[in-house]
Amino acid sequence: MKKKSALVLIFLTVFIDLLGFGILIPILPSFSVKELKIDEAAIGIAIAAYSFIQFLFNPVLGKLSDKYGRKPVIVVCLFLNAVGYIIFSFTHSYLMLLFSRIIAGIGGSSIGVAQAYIADVTTRENRSKGMGLIGSAFGLGFVFGPLIGGLLSEFGYAITGFVAAGFSMIAFVLTIFYLPESLKKHNNLTEVEQNVKKRRLFDVEAMKKILAKPDLAVLVFLFFILTFSFANIYGTFALLGLKVYGFTDIQNGYMFGIVGLTSAIVQGGLIGFVGKIMNKKSMLIIASFLIMVTLALIPYAGTFLGLAIVSIILSYGTGTFQPTILSLISEVTSESEQGITLGLNQSLSSFARVLGPLWGGFAFEYLGYPFPFLTGAAFTFIIFLLTVFYLPKKIKLD
């Protein structure tokens, strides 16, 4: 099968799966508050549990995909996603909510494998565009998923879980019957096999070796900080709409849909145009500046329209920054270590998504609703400084 067809199929698979994930985004905080009667800090823990499991399983799945192939790992993860969503539909306690997020977290650990799949079927020249497809799948999942979730919440929260599971099962079937395996049979297969055999399921030494490379380390660090800054507001964004702006689940769904649509447009095509008129250094500097400013403005937007405008600009910033950094990470990594490196990066990103919601929920409840967003802005300022003064010294960006 042609590489273009493979890209289309992996895009559809990730999109359909993330559509199910997106359905729960606007309703999880309100479900937790209205049905389970838990506070903001507990909501942060529930969100963090999902990411903590991803932190543990991302490198494991990355290494397994290097050895056994991308397709079987993706198939298993999609099935586990469906199971997690079904458990959510029957949730009547906080412990059940945590359990459902843990199962879904294992299933959601396949994104690093999907990124490795993209790396397998693209050249270094068009890899940034390929990575943008994953971002576009995220964006479209965030467009339609939250909209569907907000609308379905009118019929009960259980329905949203069943529909989310249905989407994951569609992606499951699509992957089994149509998605080709992307992992190549290298001429130096012995070397690859040795690399795999040397790695334990959670090989700290392999991670140290990868992060010891200065160019790779700074890229992973930048991605980590950005992910923390964004995860900081992941759960609190819907809480802000619910408790401060007085949004309904449907309005929260619309807001997440606006964010996702912008991200999909940027990563699905606009980033390619932007990449032709400016170099990567300029793209990263402008993006980090926009993210920093808009995060600081979110709690003070005042109205639905004001928040929508700020969110659109924020989505443009993240939509250009993330795939560019992912592309650079892939470019400075050898072919035999694409899976483990991207899996490691995804794992560290998951750890940032553990810390972010924990801090965001705590800050929202005990310090005040602006603080999760202001914290994100402060950390993004660090990204801005590193992008301007440090990153160009380590990596060729022109």
Spell out what each predicted region is:
Residues 26-40, 235-251:
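Short amphipathic helix-loop junctions that connect adjacent transmembrane helices
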Residues 58-69, 266-279, 364:
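Helix-to-loop junctions at the C-terminal end of transmembrane segments
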Residues 100-140:
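Cytoplasmic helix-loop-helix junction between adjacent transmembrane helices
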